[in-house]
A protein has these predicted regions:
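C-terminal region of N-terminal signal peptides and the immediate post-cleavage residues
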Residues: 26-49
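Acidic, polar ligand-binding/catalytic clefts
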Residues: 34, 137-201
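Periplasmic-binding protein-like
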Residues: 46-51, 182-190, 265, 269-305, ...
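Extracytoplasmic small-molecule ligand-binding "clamshell" domains
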Residues: 54-161
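Ligand-binding clefts/hinges and TM-proximal coupling segments of bilobed small-molecule sensing domains
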Residues: 66-78, 215-236, 308-343
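Bilobed "Venus flytrap"/periplasmic-binding protein-like clamshell domains
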Residues: 103, 115-132, 165-168, 184-241, ...
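Short beta-strand-to-loop elements that line the ligand-binding cleft
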Residues: 136-145, 231-241, 278
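A ligand-binding cleft/hinge motif common to bilobed small-molecule-binding domains
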Residues: 148, 164-173, 221, 247-283
Length: 343
């Protein structure tokens, strides 16, 4: 609270009265703050146990439940979809930001003609393009680094981003999300010979790599600051693309990587010298990200997802992810959608 600014803006006895109220509220906030932030004794033991749970925001949004804020499905076109359909000739395509380096999610397969983009996310993009433009190949793919996903949407460089992007309260302030299409959680990836056992005290004095702008980085910074992660854990290594962390790990420049377990499992499949350490310590959901004012496009994608969950999702999972995540794991079924009331 900026008391000096409030004081300069107020004049007269009425201003004095309001200032008294503001000061009283500020005092109450300070007195109550330690109670709102106090953690249980066992949770305050820095890194002694795996950290679970979610982070609530001031507006009441909880990250693990943020996907419930998405609007309900609809097949009706609107200004966003009309603009996409109005593109002519070779430009009549859905412009989608994707990854081209995440094995089995969005990557260029060197064994195909022209090193075609393939993966779980790519399958979903083709389904959305088919529904909107009548052609699954009517897509212009744009490779977007992890830390450029939101700017690419806000700047209008892409119509949407389908790139293992977690739905969070903070991101909902900048973009709109579809209903979730995948459930995962943060995990630790480290060399098989490493003494690191998971998201716990074994990360003390260890250098951890994360992607800039990722939910992993935000979680680690918050937990270290709150005493739920060893204070000596080094979080200074951040990279534009999540896959760069695997390279740093292979070169011995970092001791561990923290990222979505679904991505970490695919990386472990690429390199048998690394493995997942410990269980997931968060619950997260991937969604298709779009502009905040693109309500018609969000609803249209949600309608696509309704059909995709019933016809297509499981086939894509079995093709790309079952080998690394398992056929009967918690990730092996699509998450159930929940929508805003009255939407």
């Amino acid at each position: 609270m900026d008391v000096s600014r409030a004081r300069s803006a107020l004049r007269g006895w009425g201003g004095v009265a309001v200032m008294a109220v503001l000061c009283a509220l500020a005092l109450a906030f300070v007195l109550l703050l330690p109670y709102t932030q106090q953690a249980p004794d066992d949770a305050r033991q820095a890194g002694q146990k795996a950290v679970t749970g979610t982070q609530a925001r001031a507006d009441g949004c909880v990250d693990a439940e943020a996907h419930e804020r998405t609007p309900a499905p609809s097949g009706a076109d609107g200004p966003t979809i009309d603009a996409i359909k109005a593109r002519t000739g070779a430009k009549r395509k859905l412009i989608v930001g994707v990854d081209q380096n995440s094995y089995r999610w969005g990557y260029r397969n060197p064994n195909t003609d022209g090193a075609q983009l393939e993966g779980f996310d790519i399958d979903l993009v083709h389904r959305i393009a088919e529904d909107i433009l009548g052609d699954p190949d009517a897509v212009q793919f744009k490779a977007i680094p992890t830390n450029q996903r939101i700017p690419a949407i806000e700047d209008g460089r892409v119509d949407m981003v389908v790139r293992t992007m977690t739905i969070t309260c903070g991101r909902l302030e900048h973009v709109a999300f579809s209903a979730p299409y995948f459930k995962t959680g943060q995990q630790v990836l480290a060399p098989t010979s490493s003494p690191i056992t998971g998201y716990d005290a074994s990360l003390a004095h260890k250098k951890v790599c994360t992607a800039a702008g990722s939910t992993a980085l935000a979680k680690l910074e918050a937990d270290r600051k709150g005493g739920r992660l060893p204070a000596t854990t080094d979080l200074s290594t951040t990279v534009p693309n999540q896959l760069d962390c695997l390279v740093r790990l292979q070169l011995g420049e970092v001791d561990a990587v923290v990222t979505d377990g679904a991505l970490a499992a695919s990386q472990a499949a690429q390199d048998p010298t690394v493995e997942l350490k410990g269980a997931p310590f968060t619950t997260e959901y991937y969604g298709v990200a779009m502009k905040k004012d693109a309500g018609d496009l969000v609803r249209r994608v949600n309608r696509v997802l309704v059909d995709y969950r019933a016809h297509g999702w499981q086939t894509s999972y079995d093709d790309w992810l079952s080998a690394t995540l398992g056929k009967d794991s918690a990730a092996s079924k699509p998450p159930a959608p929940q929508y805003q009331r009255g939407s």
